[in-house]
Curated annotation (Swiss-Prot):
CDD domains: DEXDc_SecA, SF2_C_secA. It comes from Cutibacterium acnes (strain DSM 16379 / KPA171202). This is Protein translocase subunit SecA. InterPro entries: Helicase_ATP-bd (IPR014001), Helicase_C-like (IPR001650), P-loop_NTPase (IPR027417), SecA (IPR000185), SecA_CS (IPR020937), SecA_DEAD (IPR011115), SecA_motor_DEAD (IPR014018), SecA_preprotein_X-link_dom (IPR011130). It is found in: Cell membrane; Cytoplasm. It catalyses: ATP + H2O + cellular proteinSide 1 = ADP + phosphate + cellular proteinSide 2.
């Protein structure tokens, strides 16, 4: 345990004691709320809000608010919060991560702080891992909030902008991290305040916080638009790379997931393309195509990392086993996979707006999270987000038996042992959950189970539509379920079946809606739930006697958290359960860390393939390997954040300026001052040193491209005072500004100012993002010159930003004076003294703001970038920067017989 871990652990006891005191306060007043009728209980909300208006703090209200929610939940859902759930809610209110084991009721816990913070009316965001959970939780948990008078909504991926805007007005809003993040980016691309949907970032509760803030944190959210196409290179490089040999032409580091082209490979590529130097500046884009083709060949495997369905390459998320329809890898990698599989290559797109999840969630005034597995990443949560991890005790003691790992020489022997174990336990009726690491492995196990005559259900990328129902029934007698991953499934595996899920499904099939038929739904819910609980309880008791849910892990994941999430599905709420991992020396994790020593020992001892070993040393080696991968991934996420922090400072400047314009800031004063600065810079550029060295003609010509100069060049032939010249030009420019406003009219001029500012700012920002992407890709080479890449990125990125802002100012002024516009009548641009809209001339059409077909790139739970189109259906291309690279001017690099990255 390192120093940080010891410090964090030392404070846990104090926090737990404080949480226990809060539980005592809530329990001491519970009977007061039990005695209230429904109207009195619901009326507490108005009372709490009045007390907040009078200056009381949320901390003072907490015991009463939690007692109110506890009683409301009991009446509406039939669930009373346990003491440990009260503890979890208090931990969330105090901006911590509540680590609660699977089945401890995290969703119910979220009700408590959401209600308390929702009393402020500033908006609470509850972040889920998918749309399904956002919808279901907003409907079911929303029943309690609505009973107490709070407004509830959900942001779903197919919602139009106006519906989103209304949803954000609710006291509590459910949605996925991607939807919240993309709405933020879209708001900062809006051309008017009415197009913005979010109203701030007050308080967020992140469900499955480790998946969202850790697994998905390596890859930013990106909104892309069309860019120049260069699709012809992808199949060309796929052909070239198919002829290259590993370790002869290139090297692969599977742990780091990187490739390096060797000197011989460079020569082969140059000969095939008919070029002299692959690393000349004109050929720079080709390097990206080459690297992506090698990655597609060596690092991405069909039916594991992706599947090909209907002529499309669909990504498979290792952590969930789902295909993500419409999602694509960024940086040209998806096109390389399409070329490899000989399917249609989709279009390329360029970055229009981007932010990392780390920097998005760090914008919230208050942040909290829930998960069953956060302790292994505790120091990361503290360092990056300032969040503590509080392990909440289970409501009942955990009695699950976690058996030792069984390790086999070969994968075939391992699978045979799994099947034999499943057959034996299935005959007794014990429910079994088998976790696999890939779609291919789940299908292989499924085939073996079929041959063994074991009926089962499969949860993976090709069967995810019915996953909630499969999970809900996975605890029934005799159920056998194969799943690629159990993280974020959102449905509990309850021995005997999940009565709440069955009730919700039953009422939905009957056409009852918790939003539209609240009273009828509540009555039907109580009766239907009682029926399913009675049915499930009898089977629950029988399955308990069989040993509870048996979890089999078919191999270890890179992250200990994923293994713990699988194990955690068994033994919920004090139920019996058992788990065991079956491993082989051919498993991916074992293969990465060279198990040859163990293999040689097993051969020397003449151990048969079907004889496993139980070795504490091997188990320690596996855990050590997992820790290495986790540490490596943490460094990657920290590195992403360090670089994005540079962009984040620039982003806040740009987005802050945009927001001021949208909110009606005094644009005229700023633009007049900008005009003065641009004119002064133009004068000083040509009036350096002695007056006889000034180039007045060039000065007049250049400044004349910015605004119509009214000064006579000949009158300044003998001028020797640069300050006088500057003041005269400033005065002349301001007179020109006045004339321009007189020509257009005040209202039209104000609109033109706003349109020009937003249009030019957005375009320059897009170009800057492109340049920064290009800088980021090549910055690692600075290490070869003994320079810190991050320091160089900060310095050069800052210089590029300053240069972009100077260019932005000059272009804005030039547009204001030189743009030919057409005006026409528009209602509502101007109001009369009474505030009523009147008709006035406006700029028609808006300045250079074409409608773009956008795409959205976001991380999956593995942290890889994927892209979906605006309609959310058909996959599109992504922000490839080949066009920008081909235009970039860089010194040619000499070929050497060494690695090229």
């Amino acid at each position: 345990m390192n120093l940080m871990d010891r410090v964090l652990h030392a404070g846990e006891g104090k926090i737990i004691r404080r949480l226990n005191r809060i539980v005592g306060q809530v329990n001491s007043i519970e009977e007061d709320y039990v005695a209230m009728d429904d109207d009195e209980l619901a009326g507490q909300t108005a009372d709490f809000r009045q007390r907040l208006d009078n200056g009381e703090s949320l901390d003072r209200l907490l015991p009463e608010a939690f007692a109110t929610v506890r009683e409301a939940s009991k009446r509406v859902l039939g669930k009373r919060h346990f003491d440990v759930q009260i503890m979890g809610g208090a931990a969330l209110h105090q901006c911590n991560i509540a680590e609660m084991k699977t089945g401890e009721g995290k969703t119910l816990v979220g009700l408590l702080p959401a209600y308390l913070e929702g009393l402020l009316g500033e908006g609470v965001h509850i972040v889920t891992v998918n749309d399904y959970l956002a919808r279901v939780q907003s409907e079911q948990m929303g029943r309690v909030h609505r009973f107490l008078g709070l407004s509830i909504s959900a942001i779903l991926s197919d919602m139009p902008p106006m519906a989103r805007k209304e949803a954000y007005k609710a006291d509590v809003t459910y949605g996925t991290n991607n939807e919240f993040g993309f709405d933020y980016l879209r708001d900062n691309m809006a051309s008017s305040l009415s197009e913005c949907v979010q109203r701030g970032h007050h308080y967020a509760i992140v469900d499955e916080v480790d998946s969202i803030l850790v697994d998905e944190a390596r890859t930013p959210l990106i909104i892309s638009g069309p860019a120049e196409e260069n699709k012809q290179w992808y199949p060309e490089f796929a052909k070239i790379v198919s002829r290259l040999e590993r370790d002869v032409d290139y090297e692969v580091d599977e742990k780091k997931r990187t490739v390096s082209v060797l000197g011989h490979g460079i020569t082969v590529v140059e000969e095939r393309l008919g070029i002299e130097n692959l690393y000349e500046s004109a050929n720079t884009p080709l390097i990206g195509y080459l690297n992506n083709a090698i990655k597609a060949k060596e690092l991405f495997h069909r039916d594991k990392d992706y599947v090909v369905v209907g002529g499309e390459v669909l990504i498979v998320d290792e952590h969930t086993g789902r295909t993500l329809a419409g999602r694509r890898y960024n940086e040209g990698l998806h096109q390389a996979l399409e070329a490899k599989e000989h399917v249609e290559i989709k279009d390329e797109y360029q970055t229009l707006a981007t932010i990392t999840l780390q920097n998005y969630f760090r914008m919230y005034d208050k942040l909290a999270g829930m998960t069953g597995t956060a302790k292994t990443e505790e120091s990361e949560f503290q360092k990056i987000y300032g969040l503590g991890v509080i392990p909440i005790p289970t409501n009942r003691p955990m009695i699950r038996k976690d058996q030792k790992d069984l390790i086999y020489r070969t994968e075939d022997a391992k699978f045979d042992a799994i099947i034999a174990d499943v057959v034996e336990r299935h005959e007794a009726g014990q429910p079994i959950l088998i976790g696999t690491a890939s779609v291919a492995k789940s299908e292989l196990l499924s085939e073996k189970l079929k041959r063994a005559g074991v009926p089962h259900k499969v949860l993976n990328a090709k069967h995810h539509e019915s996953e909630a129902a499969i999970v809900a029934l996975a605890g029934r007698k005799g159920a056998v379920t194969v799943s690629t991953n159990m993280a974020g499934r959102g449905t509990d595996i309850i021995l005997g079946g999940n009565p709440e899920f069955l009730t919700e499904l039953d009422l939905r099939e009957k056409g009852l809606d918790p939003l539209e038929d609240q009273d009828a739904y509540q009555t039907a819910w109580n009766n239907t739930l009682a029926k399913y609980e009675e049915q499930s309880q009898a089977e629950h008791n029988e399955v308990e006697g069989l040993g509870g849910l048996y979890v089999i892990g078919s191999e270890r994941h890179e992250s200990r958290r994923i293994d713990n999430q699988l194990r955690g599905r068994s033994g919920r709420q004090g139920d019996p359960g058992e788990s065991r991992f079956y491993l082989s020396l051919q498993d991916e994790l074992m293969r990465l860390f060279k198990p040859e020593v163990i293999d040689r020992a097993m051969v020397t001892l003449k151990m048969p393939e079907d004889m496993p070993i139980e070795s504490k040393w091997v188990s320690r080696q596996i855990e050590s390997a997992q820790k290495q991968v986790e540490a490596q991934n943490f460094e990657m996420r920290k590195n992403v954040l360090k670089y994005d922090d540079v962009m984040n400072r620039q982003r806040h400047v740009i987005y802050g300026d945009r927001r001021k314009v949208l909110e009606g800031a005094d644009v005229e004063t700023e633009l007049r001052a900008t005009t003065d600065r641009v004119v002064e810079a133009g004068v000083r550029k040509y009036a350096e040193g002695y007056s006889e060295d000034w180039d007045l003609e060039a000065m007049w010509n250049e400044i004349g491209t910015v605004y119509p100069v009214g000064l006579d060049l000949d009158e300044y032939a003998d001028c020797q005072d640069v300050e006088e010249l500057i003041e005269d030009f400033k005065a002349d420019a301001q007179e020109a500004y006045d004339r321009r406003e007189s020509e257009l009219g005040e209202a039209t001029m104000r609109q033109l100012e706003r349109e020009v500012l937003l249009t030019v700012l957005d375009r320059k920002w897009r170009e800057h993002l492109y340049e920064m992407d290009y800088l980021r890709e090549g910055i690692g080479l600075r290490a070869m010159a003994q320079r810190d890449p991050l320091v160089e990125y900060q310095r050069e990125g800052g210089d590029m930003f300053n240069s972009m802002m100077d260019s932005f100012k000059e272009e804005v002024v030039g547009f204001l004076f030189n743009l030919e516009i057409e005006t026409g009548p528009q209602v509502g641009l101007v109001t009369d003294d009474g505030g009523n809209p009147v008709t006035a001339d406006s700029v028609l059409p808006k300045v250079n703001r074409p409608r773009r077909a956008l795409t959205y790139s976001a991380p999956d739970e593995q942290g890889e970038a994927e892209t979906t189109s605006e309609d959310g259906q058909k996959p599109r291309g992504e922000g490839n920067r080949a066009a920008r690279r081909s235009a970039a001017s860089k010194k040619p690099k000499n070929r050497r017989n060494k690695k090229r990255r």
